[in-house]
A protein has these predicted regions:
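N-terminal beta-strand motif that seeds the catalytic metal site of vicinal oxygen chelate
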Residues: 7, 11-39, 80, 136-149
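Long, continuous compositionally biased terminal/linker segments
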Residues: 15-19, 64-100
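Vicinal oxygen chelate
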Residues: 32-36, 82-126
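Glycine-rich acetyl-CoA-binding "A-motif" of GNAT/NAT acetyltransferases
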Residues: 129
Length: 149
């Protein structure tokens, strides 16, 4: 059995503790033009969603199902959407990213894409659109005038 390399992050959980039944994709690879900055971005924003860094190597880092790799050419024009279990996690995702100096692509709020669609968007260092989404089924009749477009 392959042994995981020693991790450098303080935000690491035991991979055994992750609920692997939550997976819909096995994994997604994002190739980064600035590997260290991309790892900083994903670690910052995914911590707000309780998505852990579970393993890493010399030129890759795995956050459960997302692999960030120091590869060329960098991934571009990608839209990644991460599920949030609470509305507050969407707010925390956006706040953590903006607070760390990353660019917003849409503040937290309800969208008219679907009833109860509460989301926020950030650009990763390569310009990919990264979203956190909470499907607020208890608020499907939200005030349309408060909906962000």
């Amino acid at each position: 059995m392959r042994r995981l390399p020693e991790l450098r992050s303080s935000y690491v959980v035991n991979a055994e503790a992750w609920d692997w039944s939550l997976r819909v994709l096995d994994h997604v690879d994002v190739h980064a033009s600035d590997y260290a900055e991309s790892v900083r971005f994903y670690e910052t924003v995914l911590a707000a969603l309780e998505i852990p860094r579970v393993s890493e190597g010399n030129d890759w880092t795995c956050f459960t199902n997302l692999n960030v790799a120091d590869r060329q050419p960098p991934t571009q024009n990608l839209h990644l959407c991460f599920y949030a279990r609470q509305k507050e996690q969407v707010d925390a995702f956006h706040g953590a990213g903006v607070g760390a100096g990353f660019r917003s692509n849409g503040e937290p709020g309800y969208r008219d894409y679907a009833p109860g669609y509460y989301a926020a968007y950030l650009f990763d260092p390569d310009g990919n659109n990264v979203e956190a989404l909470y499907r607020d089924i208890g608020n499907v009749g939200h005030d349309a005038s408060a909906t962000l477009k």
